[in-house]
Amino acid sequence: MRVRSIVCGVTLGAGAAFIGRAALRTTEGPAVDGELFALVNAGRGPLADGLLGGVTELGSLYAAAAAAAALAISGRRRAAASALAAATGAWLLGQGAKKLVVRPRPHDANPHGTRMVIARPKGSSWPSSHPAVLTAFTHVAARELRLGTASRVGLAALDVSVASSRVYLGVHYPSDVASGLLMGRAVARLWPGSRRLDG
């Protein structure tokens, strides 16, 4: 089971790197990424702006710390510690990748074609750390808590919602968040100390 987790983790990490390379280094990648970004970033009105502005914060380390505190208070300290540590690991990995791959944010690359809903973050656009942090947290927590399929599907939907919000709000390209999702999943698969269950 541990070997399988390592293979899956490495494969997911390679997938994240492949998406980033395709978006940055191929002829068609930037154009496709830009078109998808424009489609999602177009906006759906003030209600959607406010809702997704709140949803996106669920991918922050602060939100992970708050969720871990809630788990610890409820007596699930192992799950809290493992999930928060994995989320922190995903954040550190993402920040390290940003130093290696410097990609301008959408607004920097196209100021007049980007609808900014929130303040522009600093640093490279690739990869997106918010989905990486949340995905690492939710997957490790789900294994530690032995959550069922329905709960895991709900958490996966939350991961994707946060990832999509980053594009909608104008701070990341689709390939940035796709890589972030895979990066978070890779960290979760490789994270030691989790009760490893299939599914």
Region annotations inferred by a language model:
Residues 47-48, 76-79, 107, 147-151:
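Membrane-helix interface segments
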Residues 111-199:
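Membrane-embedded catalytic cores of phosphoryl/pyrophosphoryl-handling enzymes
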